[in-house]
């Protein structure tokens, strides 16, 4: 499996996470529809920004999730959101309850 963490800060980050929270079903359909999708988590950070974590079966899936996320942010966030800092790589462990 492959994971990507997208971390948002600065202009537009707070609005972005407000929208993610309010439009949860839309995000679930958008990112959950990526081929090879495994899981998605979004969380706010203490500094007013936040991060998302997407896990897919392979890098092709995480690349597609990033493309979809960027398009969604561009179309739905009125403030100019800074591009996210990203960290990605192959997973060494993944589990859930």
Residue ranges and their predicted role:
Residues 1-51, 57-71, 77-97:
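Short S/T/G/P-rich N-terminal loop/turn motif that feeds into the first structured element of a domain
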């Amino acid at each position: 499996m492959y994971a990507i963490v997208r971390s948002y800060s600065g202009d537009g980050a707070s609005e972005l996470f407000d929208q993610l929270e309010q439009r949860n079903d839309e995000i679930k359909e958008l990112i959950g529809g990526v081929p090879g999708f495994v899981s998605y988590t979004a969380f706010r950070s203490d500094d007013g920004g936040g991060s998302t974590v997407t896990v897919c079966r392979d890098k092709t899936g995480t690349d597609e999730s990033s493309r979809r996320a960027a398009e969604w942010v561009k179309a739905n966030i009125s403030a100019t959101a800074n591009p996210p800092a990203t960290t990605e790589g192959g997973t060494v462990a993944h589990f859930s309850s």
